[in-house]
Amino acid sequence: MRTMWWPCLVLALLSGLETSGFPRSPLQLLGKRSLPEGVVDGIEVYSTKISCKVTSRFAHNVVTTRAVNRADTAKEVSFDVELPKTAFITNFTLTIDGVTYPGNVKEKEVAQKQYEKAVSQGKTAGLVKASGRKLEKFTVSVNVAAGSKVTFELTYEELLKRNKGKYEMYLKVQPKQLVRHFEIDAHIFEPQGISMLDAEASFITNDLLGSALTKSFSGKKGHVSFKPSLDQQRSCPTCTDSLLNGDFTIVYDVNRESPGNVQIVNGYFVHFFAPQGLPVVPKNIVFVIDVSGSMSGRKIQQTREALLKILDDVKEDDYLNFILFSTDVTTWKDHLVQATPANLKEAKTFVKNIHDQSMTNINDGLLKGIEMLNKAREDHTVPERSTSIIIMLTDGDANTGESRPEKIQENVRNAIGGKFPLYNLGFGNNLNYNFLETLALENHGLARRIYEDSDANLQLQGFYEEVANPLLTNVEVEYPENAILDLTRNSYPHFYDGSEIVVAGRLVDRNMDNFKADVKGHGALNDLTFTEEVDMEEMDAALKEQGYIFGDYIERLWAYLTIEQLLEKRKNAKGDEKENITAEALDLSLKYHFVTPLTSMVVTKPEDNEDQTSIADKPGEEAIAETTTMSFLTTQQSSQSPYYYVDGDPHFIIQIPGKNDSICFNIDEKPGTVLRLIQDPVTGITVTGQIIGDKRSNASSRTGKTYFGKLGITNAWMDFRVEVTTEKIILGTGAELSTFSWLDTITVTQTGLSVTINRKKNMVVSFGDGISFVIILHQVWKKHPVHQDFLGFYVVDSHRMSAQTHGLLGQFFQPFDFKVFGIRPGSDPTKPDATMVVKNHRLTVTRGSQKDYRKDASVGTKVICWFVHNNGEGLIDGVHTDYIVPSLF
């Protein structure tokens, strides 16, 4: 699948603390050699953690910073975080010496009095303000007594929007001092499956710091971790200042087996729509460019550079023109022309000669462009199946001709008549951005600020690339009549390649059996309808595992999207309509605890024995041996080194220091099913196993004993694989295959790999020093009426496998804990029941036994274990069917 890289919705963070007497810029705490390491003016920031959890594009982010005042006097400590302008703060808590002071979201007018009182008394109040292009800065401070500890925790949520084929989270990291425990931990869960995941940091300039960054994805789950030690943070081996200063970016995309994807949880649904492979709809585009005097110098030069680059990307099926406005209006051509090579060459000559002139006549420039597009359509000089777009770039306010904003809005609205979108690009800060935004929103477009930086030309090019490839026009998303409530926006003038349409709503009947969604649109060749049908029972089963992120995510996603769209509509509303929209958005903001332009978060904390109020305020609008099913066993015994295996009917055993007990469970699946046992994206190692039954079993039966009859081991980085059956072993390196039988005794080696076959007993597969597997052959009498040969799989060394290792066996490679209590008689007097707490689940378990065949393949060693019922539910991550794969390789 094609993955396009593009700046997207930004998640930014700046976390830190500063003391009184230091500049109030974020985290400007410089290390001093005369002080203990990590302590600045008596304040030690000993922990900063950014925890990001994303489920179906909806991000839940928690920023936690902990500090201690090691001075002998009280100190003021400040907490600064930069977060995306598109995010809503949902919680802020302040904990001092174990006492937590929570935040409460209130209507802005109610909170304002508390805010003004705090400021008038000279107290520091928390606030949120704009910071850079895509960020807002949250700041709050508090006095901390000598020897006291303080914890700041900020939570915010946002919907990641897809641009140019990817979702992006961008974190601004600037502690500017060494932090004993600094960690970024991001977990991503996408039911469609993750197709790519990457992470990078601008400040990682050496291998030592780079080794602190790990990233992996498998199936539906992705993980990024950045956890540098103190030494890895240092700018030099003996320095006390930090390298952590710059941008940390995570990007990912999802699999798209169909154009749409619908997810339903607890009566709320979200519908993602992003078709691929459609032909591009030809576009008719007019660029309306401000060439007034204020555009002189660098601005006009960057505009020329951007337009020349855009002309390189215009497709030959497109039609275009340029309109320049200052006091007067001039055009390149009298009408739209096709983007032939000759016309593009002429257009570049025109662009190179653009220069600044005098005043700013926005009204006439826009009306001329609109007239040109309307006439081209009326005269049929552009393709019937094409779409029109107008893009205006200006750096100031109208000051000649019609200069009243309301009148310009009326003129443009009447001229366009809803037929095509207007996109406004505001260059710099000396302009009425609210006017440009309103003008665009009224005409199905959007506004974007172009910042006066060295990359302004790239910003202009970037915006054009967003709208360069329309795949559908007049998109309508439809659902069964009377089946839904509270639907978010479901009509869009365009769908652009690399983007995504998101619609959410509420079901009238939560017990409905199926759900259908239709998306209709005009394509380049014909009208298209995309239908997505959902079986509710299958949906419930597929989404069970999502609770490990946060269970009500679809409802919160719906609320977020609804509020966001209401606030956008509010900008153009008037009178009663505006009041009604405001009331609805306010109610939702309060209900779901979102800090929006209509609400504020109030935190009351102690300050010199008085209450102090802080405000988080968002800127405004700008039996187990006899079982007949597959059994899995985990064992923990403190006296031995960790080992892991699956054997018998098959038993999974995991041994971890610190416990002297075992856990086991069964998987009830039919013969022929292939299960993923181990998958490590870092080492590239994957192990799978195919189930066989006894001789009475058939492919559709889940009764009778089951075993592993075939195993597959691959190492993607070495281009190596081995297929093991009860009859033969096939080794493959690249395109070369070698076949051996269990009658052989042989060792095969190459760099980083060793395979040893011990005749009729076992084989050992080792990947260097630190990863070693043993496969045991179990043979029975060939004429036995029921039993047949099977395999056992043992991990005898796994210490070089990464923390991202997963699978039915691999997920237990990392330490975990469980507690057993409440032992009581069970239904079988010889097998008591008990309550087990493991992985935040409370389970009923039963005492039983399994076998360890490492020392004696015929008899085995008895292992006592606690049996987890229902296919290991609550013990394994997700459900057992998540580990079923189509084939061995």
UniProtKB/Swiss-Prot annotation:
<dbReference type="Pfam" id="PF00092">
    <property type="entry name" value="VWA"/>
</dbReference>
<feature type="domain" description="VIT">
    <location>
        <begin position="29"/>
        <end position="158"/>
    </location>
</feature>
<comment type="similarity">
    <text>Belongs to the ITIH family.</text>
</comment>
<feature type="glycosylation site" description="N-linked (GlcNAc...) asparagine">
    <location>
        <position position="91"/>
    </location>
</feature>
<keyword id="KW-0165">Cleavage on pair of basic residues</keyword>
<protein>
    <recommendedName>
        <fullName>Inter-alpha-trypsin inhibitor heavy chain H3</fullName>
    </recommendedName>
</protein>
<dbReference type="GO" id="GO:0005576">
    <property type="term" value="C:extracellular region"/>
</dbReference>
<feature type="propeptide">
    <location>
        <begin position="650"/>
        <end position="889"/>
    </location>
</feature>
<feature type="glycosylation site" description="N-linked (GlcNAc...) asparagine">
    <location>
        <position position="580"/>
    </location>
</feature>
<dbReference type="InterPro" id="IPR013694">
    <property type="entry name" value="VIT"/>
</dbReference>
<comment type="subunit">
    <text>I-alpha-I plasma protease inhibitors are assembled from one or two heavy chains (HC) and one light chain, bikunin. Pre-alpha-inhibitor (P-alpha-I) is composed of ITIH3/HC3 and bikunin.</text>
</comment>
<dbReference type="GO" id="GO:0030212">
    <property type="term" value="P:hyaluronan metabolic process"/>
</dbReference>
<comment type="function">
    <text>May act as a carrier of hyaluronan in serum or as a binding protein between hyaluronan and other matrix protein, including those on cell surfaces in tissues to regulate the localization, synthesis and degradation of hyaluronan which are essential to cells undergoing biological processes.</text>
</comment>
<keyword id="KW-0722">Serine protease inhibitor</keyword>
<feature type="domain" description="VWFA">
    <location>
        <begin position="284"/>
        <end position="467"/>
    </location>
</feature>
<dbReference type="Pfam" id="PF06668">
    <property type="entry name" value="ITI_HC_C"/>
</dbReference>
<keyword id="KW-0732">Signal</keyword>
<dbReference type="InterPro" id="IPR036465">
    <property type="entry name" value="vWFA_dom_sf"/>
</dbReference>
<keyword id="KW-0325">Glycoprotein</keyword>
<dbReference type="GO" id="GO:0062023">
    <property type="term" value="C:collagen-containing extracellular matrix"/>
</dbReference>
<dbReference type="InterPro" id="IPR002035">
    <property type="entry name" value="VWF_A"/>
</dbReference>
<keyword id="KW-0654">Proteoglycan</keyword>
<dbReference type="InterPro" id="IPR050934">
    <property type="entry name" value="ITIH"/>
</dbReference>
<dbReference type="GO" id="GO:0004867">
    <property type="term" value="F:serine-type endopeptidase inhibitor activity"/>
</dbReference>
<feature type="modified residue" description="Aspartate 1-(chondroitin 4-sulfate)-ester">
    <location>
        <position position="649"/>
    </location>
</feature>
<feature type="propeptide">
    <location>
        <begin position="22"/>
        <end position="33"/>
    </location>
</feature>
<keyword id="KW-0646">Protease inhibitor</keyword>
<keyword id="KW-0964">Secreted</keyword>
<dbReference type="InterPro" id="IPR010600">
    <property type="entry name" value="ITI_HC_C"/>
</dbReference>
<feature type="signal peptide">
    <location>
        <begin position="1"/>
        <end position="21"/>
    </location>
</feature>
<dbReference type="Pfam" id="PF08487">
    <property type="entry name" value="VIT"/>
</dbReference>
